[in-house]
Amino acid sequence: MSKVRPYVVGRLRKEVLGRSYIGGIVTSREGDGSYNRVLAADANLVIAEHLQVGAMLARSFEPAAGGERWVRHAAAQWRDDFLQAGFTVLDISPDFNPGVGFVMRRERMMGGSVALRPRPSSQLVRQFEISSSLVYFHDDERNLMTRRATVRLGTFFESGDQIRLDLKNRVEVLERPFAISRSPEVMLAEGRHEWSSVNLELRTFNGRTVQGTLSGEIGDFWTGTKRSVSVSGNARPNPNLSLEPSYSFNDVDLPEGSFTTHLVGLRTNFSVTADLLTSVFVQYNSSGDLAAVQVRLNYIFRQIDNVYVVYNVTRFTDGVYDGLSNSSLVLKVTYSLHR
């Protein structure tokens, strides 16, 4: 028999000092004779024309739960037409449990980025971009777990089209063997792994009736190599209808084994009226033999105030979990107290 676990999410935000805000979040989930609750406070302050700082503090509560259950986050960002720079730190305690949602990794993260975007005197090119970013994850003893470094060269044309070249380097430290693929089963050994790759992306102007993005990546991957191709688009046959297809392909060749993956998706957006919007998203992932469907209804009952009804269902189509599924029904209401 399927289990029903009701949950509630509440969000309160107040605008202050013009473009800044302070807020709070509470989540509660019941089930299996227990509960999980999370309280959080956050703020985003625009302290100068181009400078923003933000912070968040959260804690989870469960019966008989011990240990550290905190999340701490702080960030600062400078953004103007020529220079963009930012820095962020995140600390997630080992025993923090969000209850609603998930945490990918309970570690400490530090990251920073800087970008220069000069505007040349050209009728063809609107702006160039030269940027770099570095993200670093470590454990409580400051041992490296993950490092991601990227250098980007980009060109923005006067037509609205874009081209980007990314040079990537990544380090992963595995504390135990890792199954990178289940079908076929491919296991990676514990230890330090480092690889580099190059990604090229072409993006057309999104103001056109038909818009598309094409990207390809080639390079090392863990202990071997990987080739990837992704294509996505957006077509607007009329003002009330838009179609957003997407497809991604990965060809992975490792000494431990080789495999390919396919990810296919289609999002359909339809405006019944100016105040009633609908969307349906369908996706299939070959790597997990997993199909997913999301149906969303959005009613705008007042300017910036909305009611959302979202139904999600995922289902395994093959393998050991064939036939198993998970579904959820979500009601979300946004209401501005001060207008």
Model-derived segments and spans:
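A conserved hydrophobic secondary-structure block that centers on an alpha-helix together
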Residues: 1-34, 42
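Short glycine-rich loop/turn motifs
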Residues: 7-9, 21, 40, 197-199, ...
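Short, solvent-exposed loop/edge-beta patches enriched in aromatic
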Residues: 14-18, 47, 157
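Extended, well-ordered alpha-helical scaffold/bundle regions in very large, multi-domain proteins
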Residues: 33-36, 44-46, 52-62
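Exposed, low-structure sequence patches enriched in small/polar residues
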Residues: 56-339
